[in-house]
Amino acid sequence: MAGFRLTTKVQVSGWRFLLRRVEHAIVRRDTRMFDDPLQFYSRAVFAGVVVSVLICLGAALMAYFKPLGKQGSDQLLVDRTTNQLYVMLPGSNQLRPVYNLTSARLVLGNASNPVAVKSEELNRISKGQSIGIPGAPYATPTGTPASQWTLCDTVAKPDSSAPKVETSILIRTLAIDSGVGPIRADQGMLVSYEGANWLITEGGRHSIDLADRAVTSAVGIPVTAKPTPISQGLFNALPNRGPWQLPQIPAAGAPNSVGLPENLVIGSVFRTATESDPQHYVVLPDGVARVNNTTAAALRATNSYGLMQPPAVEASVVAKIPEQVYVSPLPDQPLDVLLRQDSPVLCWSWQREPGDQAPKTTVIAGRRLPLPASAIGTGIDQIGGDSTVYIEGGQFVRLQSPDPRVGESMYYIDPQGVRYGIANDDAAKNLGLAGPVNAPWQVVGLLVDGPVLSKEAALIEHDTLPADPNPRKVASGEG
C-alpha cells in the first residue's frame, strides 16, 4: 500500500496553506498573514446551512399544526381573494356573510379580528343569508379622547340682505390666538334668530328690543348696528340669560314720600355728592335703590323727569332712607359691540378635563375658525347634518340627555362625524370600546345619526342593503 502513496499529509497541508496564502494575497494584498479572517468563511457557511435547515423545519411544523388559508376553529373569517367577511354563528355549520366588522363583533360577543381563509376552503362550507347592521361603521377605532367640543357659526356676506350661515363642529383642541378668542366681559355681539334680536355676551344670550333706544344706547349698541342670523344649533347651545330690559317702577312720576327733595319723583335718578366716584340711585315708592351707571343712563333716557343732570344728594340724607333693590340685568359699563364684518365667526365651546367637577363653557368670536393650520381643509361636509365636522379620530362618549326620562346615553362617533348609539355596556365591550368621555348633547345632537349598535340589530338577515334615501353626487373633478 505504501507504493501507491503519491503525497503525504504534510504535502497536502502545505498545499492548502499555500492556497490560503494566495487567496489572502489576492483579497487583502498582503502575504504575511499576521491574521487570517478568511478561515472563518467555512464556519459562516456551515452556520448558515444550519439556520436555513431550522427555518425550513419550523415552517413545515407551522404549516402542519396551523395551516394558513384553513378555517380551523375560527368563527370570524375573511376571504383572502375578495375580502368578504364571514361569521360562523355559535351552534351553526353555516357561514354568514356579514356587512362589517362591527356587526361581526357584536354577533360573536368579542372584539376579535378576522382570520384570512382561501376562497376554495370557504366554497366548501354551506352559506346562509347576509347579516349585520346596514349603515354601521366598518370598525370602531378611537383617537385621542376629546375634552373640548365646539360649535361655530360663520357668516358669509354679513352686509347683504340675506347673510349665509355655515355651521362647523369642532371635536378637537382649539387654536386660540389674536385672530380668534373668548369674548371678554366688556364685549358683545348682536344676532337674530327667528325674527327676534339677541345680544351675545360671555355668559350667553340676552333678548333685546332694538327699538328701545334708552337701553340699547346705554349698553353701547350703535344705532347703525345690524343683527346677523345664527343657526338653531348655536342658538340652543347658548344659555338664555334673560332679557335686557328695565323692570317697571310702580307709580313712576308720582311725588316721593321718603324725604327727598320734591324734584325727585318716583322713578327719577340722583347721585350721592360726597363720593369721588358718585353712586347712582333710583327713587322707588318705599325707598331708594342703588343702580349702576348703565342702568342710571337707561332710566334717564327713558324719562329724566325734567332733570338735566342727576341731582346730588347728601350721603347723610340717603343713609336715613330705606334701601330697596332694583333688579336690573344691564352690565356695569357699556359694551364694545363686535361687528360680524370684523368677526364673522361666533362659537360656543364646552370643555371638561379629567378631574374637573363641572364643564367650562366659553363664547368665542374672531375672524376665522379656532383651528390650527394643520386642520384647515380637513373638515367633513356632512350631507344630512348641514354641518362641517372637524374631528381627531373616533370618539366613545357618554352624555346626559336633556330629556330626564332618557338618562345617560353612550355613543360612538366615527372619524366621519356620524354618531351611533351604543345599546349597553356589553355592546361597548364587544366593540373594544372602553373609558367613555363626557360630551355635550348640544354638539353631539347635531351630528348625523346612524343606527344603534346592538347584538339584536346585528342578527337581522338581509337579502340586500337598503338604498340611501339622501345621497349626494360627488363634486365634479373628484370622480
From Swiss-Prot:
Keyword Zinc listed? no
Q: Where does this protein chiefly localize?
A: membrane
Report disulfide bridges, numbered on this chain.
Answer: 152-347
Its keywords, alphabetically, are: ATP-binding, Cell inner membrane, Cell membrane, Disulfide bond, Hydrolase, Membrane, Nucleotide-binding, Transmembrane, Transmembrane helix, Transport
Subcellular localization, per the record?
Cell inner membrane
Q: Which Pfam families match?
A: T7SS_ESX1_EccB
Record's bilayer topology term = Single-pass membrane protein
Q: Name one GO molecular function term.
A: hydrolase activity
Q: Which residues face the membrane's Cytoplasmic side?
A: 1-44
Any one GO cellular component localisation term in the record: plasma membrane
According to the UniProt topology, which residue ranges lie Periplasmic?
66-479
Q: Which PANTHER family match?
A: ESX-2 SECRETION SYSTEM ATPASE ECCB2
What the protein does comes down to: An ATPase. Part of the ESX-1 / type VII specialized secretion system (T7SS), which exports several proteins including EsxA and EsxB. Plays a role in DNA conjugation, in both donor and recipient strains.
* Miscellaneous notes: DNA conjugation in M.smegmatis is unidirectional with distinct donor and recipient strains; mc(2)155 is a donor strain while MKD8 is a recipient strain. Mutations in a donor strain that alter DNA transfer do not always alter DNA transfer in a recipient strain.
Record's subunit section: Part of the ESX-1 / type VII secretion system (T7SS), which is composed of cytosolic and membrane components. The ESX-1 membrane complex is composed of EccB1, EccCa1, EccCb1, EccD1 and EccE1.
The name this protein carries in UniProt is: ESX-1 secretion system ATPase EccB1
Q: What species was this sequence derived from?
A: Mycolicibacterium smegmatis (strain MKD8) (Mycobacterium smegmatis)
